[in-house]
Amino acid sequence: MAKTKGLPKDTAVTPSPHLRPHTADLNRLLAGEHHDPHSILGAHEYDDHTVIRAYRPHATEVAAVVGGERHVFTHLEAGVFAVTLPFTGLIDYRLEVGYDHGGDQPHIHHTADAYRFLPTLGEMDLHLFSEGRHERLWEVLGAHPRTFETPDGVVEGVSFAVWAPNANGVQLIGDFNHWDGNEAQLRVLGSTGVWELFWPDFPVDGLYKFRIHGADGVVSERADPMAFATEVPPQTASRVTTSSYTWNDDAWMTQRAAQNPVFEPMSTLEVHLMSWRPGLSYVELADQLTEYIVEHGFTHVEMLPVAEHPFGGSWGYQVTSYYAPTSRLGTPDEFRYLVDRLHQAGIGVIVDWVPAHFPKDAWALGRFDGTALYEHADPRRGEQLDWGTYVFDFGRAEVRNFLVANALYWLQEFHVDGLRVDAVASMLYLDYSRPEGGWTPNIYGGRENLEAVQFLQEMNATVHKASPGIVTIAEESTSWPGVTRPTNLGGLGFSMKWNMGWMNDTLAFISRDPIHRSYHHHEMTFSMLYAFSENYVLPISHDEVVHGKGTLWGRMLGDDHRKAAGVRQLLAYQWAHPGKQLLFQGQEFGQRAEWSEERGVDWYQLDENSYSGGILRMISDMNGIYTSHRALWSHDTSPEGYSWIDANDSTNNVLSFLRYGDDGSVLACVFNFSGSEHSQYRLGLPHAGTWREVLNTDAADYNGAGIGNYGAVQATDEPWHGRPASAVMVLPPLSALWFEPVAAEAPVVQEPPTAPPLS
């Protein structure tokens, strides 16, 4: 702002007959409902002269400075000003806008005219978006700082673009205009429904919203669907931001592109960033979370949704700003720093992604332009009754584009290594959690959501092509076929899916008294009937430690010693079973209390001599064993990697099997689910020789009883369990033992797997 002193001299010209716009145009402009305000405002040539118009409702005076001469505008009506220039071919000019702030003279704001600039979106961008094929949509929609070279100097500002095809008008509001959008009205670009405006001098870090004049007659103030940053909730404005981050994870990204995660180790700790250690920022998490993950040997961290969400109690699963990391913990570049630090430490980063539904907040996506825009118009398809949310219209090209580009955005802009897609089952079935008569069938009369299937296939095919080496994981709780089958073979194209059947059966079994487990032995063997039908992740997730379900510790019966033994055994079983393992924060040391997003993990339990400390030490050791033994992960998805030793010893409550690696290695895993020690248990093995005890969950180091086999067993040529050799061993109660052959004594010969049990 500046005083009027020293302004260029005023120039008077006979007013043009075109000075005042047509009444209909003027009325639409004043109502905030003009589709092309640029056709009225800015500079326009008429025969031998030029008219410049400006809409500045709070100004007391407006002038245009052209070549050092000051041309004072006439106030026409309600803040609309205009001036006539006695020539054509205007090259450039600046506006001087005076505001009365109570002083002797008005304060003058010098600026370029927003309505002088051409659209910042190209025809190809608009075409690709309307076709649903703009893979870098975030580069054209949303808020983008720009710099233009003009004859009168450099102009800096921000371009804004938003999709609202049924809106009667769109205005930009923010701190820059005291949240009054009359002077900053966007234009619609052709028939695309995209509204656009470049606003000079808009500051980076400035707050903004769009005022949408909806087709339903309702005027609402909306956050930008493509916002890259936001205010800290519960505030809801979007924030202009740019990235200046320099990545330091080239080695990781190169390695990622060369690998297929399906055939690599994956031991994942699932983390809710806000409650892992409450109060930490992204920058602080970069130190503390990275150190913790590395110390305890996990290969990946999976973050509950990071995208901005207004309600903390949703844990991030009701997203309002899909392109903005939550501002609760810092800036987007600070989130990049967190990912970068994890990568530099050799840790993969997976984020939960929620394309199934979104909340109904009046300032967000719902009925965005006064119509069902992002959501399906038919409430029988467009609303998720259980969650009180809207369901995306997966059949609309622009909506699919918004979501597919969003998946790419997280993978490419933030270098995340994978997306865990939430609530896939709710997307696949039109009758999901709906009463009879409360859903509509597809074109073939079925309940499959064909549009959602097409979207998931498109998303998976696109992200895997654009970002080789990333992983997509489906939370899919039904038996939908081909979830991890490639899209060119008719599958959905996910890399992996959560094995909810394994999780439910296993947690049901370990919750039983060991005395009764013999009668439920099938719960622990059934998963092997389908273990290789998909590429599985074995989840013990946040969903299993909330809402009265208890914790792993709480599910175990008996005193603390038995509870700890049961937790250790369960985790060793999870790590040994085919599939990648995922464990929610706190369960890696047997947290006793259920999780709540309102408080942190119960770190106080980690006394060095506590049962929790023992469980965590075992996790650290077990992760080291896991990553160094290819038998535990290289054949996770094929029968070649697994063979039962004995699946049917329900009398003793013992399960045993072999895991094979693609390098010919073998690991024998045996589990005693009874509460009694078996002191003379004979186990069939592939060959004679020394078999080293790689893991004993009852070890004293883990605060177990220390019962075991002194580190090894000797296998002889006595056949047992259909194997040519066997060893007699001690099985502690509620324990898991892993054995590997001593390589110098006996080379391992890979054998074909046996059939899964039928009983």
UniProtKB/Swiss-Prot annotation:
**Family that this chain belongs to:** Belongs to the glycosyl hydrolase 13 family. GlgB subfamily.
Could you list this entry's UniProt keywords, alphabetically sorted: Carbohydrate metabolism, Glycogen biosynthesis, Glycogen metabolism, Glycosyltransferase, Transferase
Task: State the species of origin.
Answer: Mycobacterium sp. (strain KMS)
Cystine links in this protein are none
UniProt subunit comment: Monomer.
Single GO term (MF) = hydrolase activity, hydrolyzing O-glycosyl compounds
Q: Which GO terms describe its cellular component?
A: cytosol
| Pathway where it operates | Glycan biosynthesis; glycogen biosynthesis
GO terms for biological process, alphabetical: glycogen biosynthetic process
SMART domains the record matches: Aamy
Pfam families, per this entry?
Answer: Alpha-amylase (PF00128), Alpha-amylase_C (PF02806), CBM_48 (PF02922), GlgB_N (PF22019)
Give me the ranges of the annotated region Disordered.
1-22
Please list the residues that make up the active site.
Answer: 422, 475
The record's catalysed reaction(s) read: Transfers a segment of a (1->4)-alpha-D-glucan chain to a primary hydroxy group in a similar glucan chain
Q: Does the keyword Transferase apply?
A: yes
PANTHER family given in the database record: 1,4-ALPHA-GLUCAN-BRANCHING ENZYME (PTHR43651:SF3)
User: What protein name does the entry list?
Assistant: 1,4-alpha-glucan branching enzyme GlgB
Protein function: Catalyzes the formation of the alpha-1,6-glucosidic linkages in glycogen by scission of a 1,4-alpha-linked oligosaccharide from growing alpha-1,4-glucan chains and the subsequent attachment of the oligosaccharide to the alpha-1,6 position.
Reported EC number(s) for this entry are: 2.4.1.18
Annotated Gene3D superfamilies: Glycosidases (3.20.20.80), Golgi alpha-mannosidase II (2.60.40.1180), Immunoglobulins (2.60.40.10)
